[in-house]
Amino acid sequence: MASSCSRRLLAAALLPWCCAAWALGHLDPPSPPPLVIWHGMGDSCCNPMSMGVIKKMVEKEIPGIYVLSLEIGKNMMEDVENSFFLNVNVQVNMVCQILEKDPKLQQGYNAIGFSQGGQFLRAVAQRCPTPPMMTLISVGGQHQGVFGLPRCPGESSHICDFIRKSLNAGAYSKLVQERLVQAQYWHDPIKESVYRNYSIFLADINQERCVNESYKKNLMALKKFVMVKFFNDSIVDPVDSEWFGFYRSGQAKETIPLQESTLYTEDRLGLKKMDKAGKLVFLAKEGDHLQISKEWFTAHIIPFLK
């Protein structure tokens, strides 16, 4: 029979393990990664019919998640106006500062960009690695730009008529480039050299003029880069841009996929390495621009946010 001294020694040895097991059993489950959302053209952070719905949907499906829907400006009206008229580089810089100062994002975050918000958040990933973006989901984003503005959503059509005329008159003039957001990702495949030299946003983040190794390194740090393409999109021209494809240089009829582009074959942005590593995810959906049901969003997007 064990002596009382032996029993005391055994109890003393087991006590720390018992306490540790008890503590582990009572730890709160880890919080889900926070989410940052950037809306599209003519929309706002908090529109109850668009981004407000998305925010509530995410919060319902992932209890306890922190969702930051970006407002570019002092109020919703200014947010909408800035989606048309505030220099994208200024917007990206503003967002980088917002994210850097938010204590809830410092361990990393996931991001969803809707329409032009997709390429804007990619610029954030490339230019501002702190705090780290983990997964980027681009829903209808135009990563190789657009060459046409066929239709505008909602009540913004009159603004788009003005923008369309300005783009046709001189998309790469200094005045238009600095004052119209859509001009800053306007990509003329017939005038590639003009685009490369005078595009103040897209040509930069797509490494058209030179290779910024920091951009490449920062983008490759993503765990996943998810791109959603809408087969019946009547707003994005060409729709292939939503998967990083575009018109073959020198004409505006035949499109080529990302994998046939110089950006990919020369791996100027790290997309080829990301593709080989399984980090690029290409999702396709029937329907027009940003036509997403709750069921589709829950089945295809929510899993990337957990």
Swiss-Prot record:
Superkingdom to which the source organism belongs: Eukaryota
Entry comment describing in which tissues the protein is expressed: Highest level in testis and kidney, lower in heart, brain and lung and lowest in skeletal muscle.
SUPFAM superfamilies reported for this sequence: alpha/beta-Hydrolases
Location(s) in or outside the cell: Lysosome; Secreted; Golgi apparatus; Endoplasmic reticulum
InterPro entries assigned to the protein according to its UniProt record, in alphabetical order: AB_hydrolase_fold, Palm_thioest
Residues annotated as the enzyme's active site: S115, D233, H289
Disulfide bonds: C45-C46, C96-C128, C152-C160
Pfam families linked: Palm_thioest
Molecular-function GO terms, alphabetical: long-chain fatty acyl-CoA hydrolase activity; lysophosphatidic acid binding; palmitoyl-(protein) hydrolase activity; phospholipase A2 inhibitor activity; sulfatide binding
Secreted listed as a keyword: yes
GO cellular component: axon; cytosol; dendrite; extracellular region; extracellular space; Golgi apparatus; lysosomal membrane; lysosome
Principal location: other
Signal sequence interval, chain numbering: 1-27
Reaction(s) catalysed (UniProt annotation): S-hexadecanoyl-L-cysteinyl-[protein] + H2O = L-cysteinyl-[protein] + hexadecanoate + H(+); hexadecanoyl-CoA + H2O = hexadecanoate + CoA + H(+); S-hexadecanoyl-N-acetylcysteamine + H2O = N-acetylcysteamine + hexadecanoate + H(+); S-hexadecanoyl-N-acetylcysteine methyl ester + H2O = N-acetylcysteine methyl ester + hexadecanoate + H(+)
Glycan attachment residues as annotated in the record: N197, N212, N232
Family listed: Belongs to the palmitoyl-protein thioesterase family.
Purpose: Has thioesterase activity against fatty acid thioesters with 14 -18 carbons, including palmitoyl-CoA, S-palmitoyl-N-acetylcysteamine, and palmitoylated proteins. In contrast to PPT2, PPT1 can hydrolyze palmitoylated proteins and palmitoylcysteine.
Record's protein name: Palmitoyl-protein thioesterase 1
Source organism per UniProt: Mus musculus
